């Protein structure tokens, strides 16, 4: 069924200039994986397709099977999704999955709580993909804030969301973007 809500941040001191103004977005129904892509799953793809391993693949802080893959670029993420018969979600789908029907600021609500996600620029390592069950989004998706960034299908344009019209299944502009991570690992 179609989904409508105000997408992106309202203009405020906290919002970045390219995150507004808020606007209405309609999305068709879609499915999203519950967890970030694990090193185990990504390793199967690397082996089966002969795909190059991503950055950090040999880093012992980041390469346990249950940890999310780190260092994959946009093309790697897209190729992995296609291998699994899936696709990268557009930013609007990822944002809906993270914020829920009330458009929360964080997957768990509107108050920042660093104990509910793997945050910080001095992280020693990523956490397993099923970490922080108390911060699972309304739609049941883990780690939509913190841990590693997630690539989306859209590309970046600082003026893209400056339009005020309603959007239906937006696909975004022309430079790749990621969402949700720690600021440390992609």
Which functions belong to the PLM regions below?
Residues 17-19:
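Residues that act as N-cap/strand-start positions at coil-to-secondary-structure junctions
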Residues 21-22, 36, 68, 89:
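Proline-centered helix-kink/hinge sites
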Residues 30, 37, 43-54, 84-85:
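Short capping motifs at secondary-structure boundaries
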Residues 35-36, 145:
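Generic detection of long, well-ordered alpha-helical segments
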Residues 22-24, 29:
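Well-ordered beta-strand positions in beta-sheet-rich domains
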Residues 1-15, 52-186:
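Functional-site microenvironments in short loops/helix caps that host divalent-cation chemistry
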